[in-house]
Amino acid sequence: AGARRFLVRRHLLAPPRALPPEPGSVLRVLDRLGSLQFDPLEVAGRNHDLTLLARVGGYRRSWTDELLYRDRVLYETYNKMLSLVPTAELPWYRVTWDRRREGHDGGAFDEHAPLVEELLGRIRDTGPLSSTDVKPRATIDWYWRPTNQVRALLEAMAEAGILAIERR
C-alpha cells in the first residue's frame, strides 16, 4: 500500500488534477516523468493530452502545442516510442540518433542519396517541408509497409536527429 501511494504521488496522480491550470504545469509533468508518449492521432483524444488531463486542472491542449511548436521548449523524438521530451535534454539523445543514422547509412541514405540531398537542399533553401510538398516517388519497403520514398527518408532523417518535425 505504501509503494502504491508513493507511485501515485510520484506520478502526480494524487490528488487528481492538482497542478494549477497553466502551461507551466505541462513542463512540471514532463520534468517529473521525463517524457510523454506522443500520439498525434485522436481516437478518444491524443495520448499526451489524456495524460496531462489527469494531472493538470483545467488543462488546455493548446498549451502543449504552443510549448512544442511555438516556444520549442518541447521536442518530438523517439524514447522507446514517439515521445515529447524537454528540449534541454536533447544532448542526451545524440547517442540514439547516431545509432539510427548508422542504421540508415549504407541503407536508405546511401541507396537514395540523390533524393536525400534534394530534400536537404530544399529545406535549406525554403525552410520546413512536408512529404506532400514533394512529387511522390516510388514506394520502398519501410518499417510496417511500403512507403513513399520521400516520406520514408524524411522520417529516417528525423530518427537520425538530422531533421525535426516543424508541425503536425
Description of each model-found segment:
Residues 1-168:
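Long, low-complexity intrinsically disordered regions
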